[in-house]
Amino acid sequence: HENRFRQSLKIYSGTQSVSNFRPTAAKLIYEKFGGDVIWDMSCGWGGRLLGFLSASNTKQYIGTEPSSKTYDGLQKMVKDFSYLGKQVNIYKLGSEEYKPMEESFDLCFTSPPYFDTEKYSLESTQSFVKFPTENEWVNGFLKKTIQNCYNGLKDNKYMLINIANTPKYKFIEKETVRISKELGFVQEDTVQLTLSSVMGAGYKYEPIFVFRKESK
């Protein structure tokens, strides 16, 4: 089953860019790691929301998204799929500001912005605008988001983060792992997400870091 999951993730993650997470890949992740209540810390364009709506084991999706335009599009998507009867709550704010109820989530799963690589808007709520230096972004956005995940997750439940270094910023993966471990998570795995195929160069992969909150 484990090998099948890994192979399927490579196939179904397809050729979408990271800012539009492929719903079929998200569905696989929900059905392997998820449960009733999901927090998507950076909703983006709705790929993980669509995966939630199609997954067999999910009941409530909580999302945070600071971009006004993206938020409006997500709300339209929620309305369009309301007939499925699943509960969806999306809040227009950054994940560093959202304070979840303690031990209320079965899974935290997202692909956050890669510092200033992906710019959904130039609003003051965007993490790269609020935290314009690498150090400010790591401590003001990334660390606070991971801390909120830890507080909100039930014991022995998972946080999955798809995030990668970029040619300009080499610190992103290392800092994500370091902070997660410092805050109490155990890293259990790293799985590969297929992003794209380049003519003659094969497929491009990004990591999805798999962390578990241990029992107290």
Go through each PLM region and give its residues.
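Class I S-adenosyl-L-methionine-dependent methyltransferase catalytic core
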Residues: 1-216
